[in-house]
Regions:
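FMN-binding flavodoxin-like domain, especially the glycine-rich phosphate-binding loop
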Residues: 1-116
């Protein structure tokens, strides 16, 4: 993950690097850029970054992640659904279900980058 890049950046900086982020939320450019700005500082901010939707399976989540998601769902449930951001809607729609949003199309930009 990112900790590997941080620890080994000097050794990797002359290589062709890429970061693939995976999440349950549908892609939203503003949110993606905010996450990148928060997590990719200094040298890492210049590494090409890609996004693909993954899966949602509460049974496979750690206790900590499952608890945090449930707390977040409870907080969002108090809002008017008309005001939900895309990630909020996705989170609420997934509640109590197993979801799989994986699609090979998410890999296309990454594979094109690697191929160049």
């Amino acid at each position: 993950g990112l900790s590997f890049f941080r620890k080994n950046y000097d050794m990797l900086k002359n290589k062709k690097l890429a970061i693939l982020c995976v999440g349950a939320s549908p892609f939203e450019n503003q949110a993606f850029n905010e996450v990148k700005a928060r997590n990719l500082k200094e040298d890492l901010k210049n590494i090409p970054t890609f996004y693909g939707r993954g899966t949602w399976d509460e049974e496979k989540m750690s206790f900590k992640d499952r608890t945090l998601c449930k707390l977040l769902q409870k907080a969002i449930a108090n809002k008017d659904p008309k005001t939900y951001e895309p990630w909020m809607k996705a989170l609420m729609d997934a509640m109590g279900k197993k979801c799989d949003w994986t699609d090979k199309k998410y890999l296309k930009p990454l594979l094109e980058y690697i191929g160049n």
